[in-house]
A protein has these predicted regions:
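A composition-driven surface/loop motif
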Residues: 6-9, 16, 20, 24-327
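N-terminal secretory signal peptides that target proteins for export/translocation
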Residues: 1-2
Length: 328
């Protein structure tokens, strides 16, 4: 009788496993596959303690990894199929778009891109372009993306020989960190999908990294939430005046951004202390079409517009057609 119960339990377990999606069974089996089914091979990068895949054509990425990243050097379409690239064992961004390159990211299912010791979740270098789309028409495909937090990281814990790495926070989606407010971020286009982007320290949720401007940002659809570290999706959370912050969508604190154009979708953006929810200085923001927009500025800053009175230059905000909502 006991043997029958064990056998019945095993049958039930097999049956339940058969009901799980393939991605659940394959968790941890990170793959980069070409359209013809051929698997792309990565190469080791000892400096960053990581395996890197140079993407030169259309690929599908699936599975989970802690120490593998993609670099687009020309033009490619990357389908993220329930991919989880949470890099807590290496340096660099999960996905990097090189200077002058162009990448389209197509979302399928639940996807996570998380940088660890160095870099934004998606690095969009100067002159590069990234376009994010959902495979579905109802924005059920998701992307959660975050930049590296400010802090000191032990090299040996990431495969290095010793010592430590001290970094500032980075943007969720955007450019690298620099020491002056120059436009080092490329173009960021969001067309569909449900996207949550978080930046840390001076990094914007979407836009500029530490002391870097935000580049051109176009949002034409989707459900987009962008936060700078220290903010909260349920409302702005007060932090000390010396906390390092950036805009929700736009530039690093006190830095400009390229034009920000929002023509569709549902957009919520939360700026840090002294930073707008959406904007920069200088920066022109245009909201049009059927976009539903809410911008939460940190203390001393506008919901949509510029920084506090002591930082940055003037900008222009244009709202036409359906009016967005701005909260300070």
């Amino acid at each position: 009788m006991k043997g029958k119960r064990i056998w019945s339990g095993l049958l039930a377990l097999v049956f339940c496993l058969g009901l799980l999606p393939a991605t659940a069974l394959a968790a941890g089996n990170f793959t980069v596959t070409k359209l013809d089914g051929e698997t792309v091979a990565g190469s080791e990068n000892a400096e960053n303690y990581t395996k890197e895949y140079t993407v030169t054509e259309d690929v599908t990425v699936a599975g989970r990894t802690r120490n593998e990243r993609l670099i687009v050097k020309e033009e490619a379409t990357i389908t993220l199929n329930n991919a989880n690239m949470s890099l807590n064992e290496c340096k660099g961004s999960p996905i990097e778009i090189a200077e002058g390159a162009s990448a389209t990211l197509i979302l399928e299912g639940e996807n996570t891109l998380s940088a660890f010791a160095d870099g934004p979740g998606i690095l969009v270098n100067q002159g590069a372009t990234v376009t994010i789309q959902s495979q579905s028409d109802d924005n059920t495909d998701r992307l959660t993306v975050s930049g590296a937090k400010a802090g000191t990281y032990v090299s040996a814990e990431m495969g290095g020989g010793g010592g430590s790495i001290t970094t500032d926070g980075y943007a969720g989606i955007g450019g690298p960190n620099f020491d002056e407010a120059t436009n080092y971020t490329g173009a960021i286009n969001i067309e569909s999908g449900t996207i949550t982007a978080t930046g840390y320290s001076y990094g914007a949720g979407i836009g500029g990294g530490n002391f870097s401007s935000g580049g051109t940002i176009n949002i034409s659809g989707g459900v987009v939430t962008a936060l700078s570290g220290g903010t909260d999706p349920d409302g702005w959370v007060g932090v000390p005046a010396d906390t390092k912050m950036g805009a929700g969508i736009g530039g690093s604190q006190g830095c400009g951004s390229g034009d920000i154009n929002i023509s569709g979708g549902i957009v919520k953006a939360y700026g840090g202390y002294g930073c707008p929810g959406i904007g920069g200085a200088p920066c022109d923001v245009t909201i049009s079409g059927n976009a539903e927009v809410t911008g939460y500025g940190g203390d001393l800053a506008a919901g949509i517009g510029g920084y506090d009175k002591d930082k940055g230059e003037s900008n222009e905000v244009t709202i036409s057609d359906k009016i967005g909502r701005a909260h300070v």
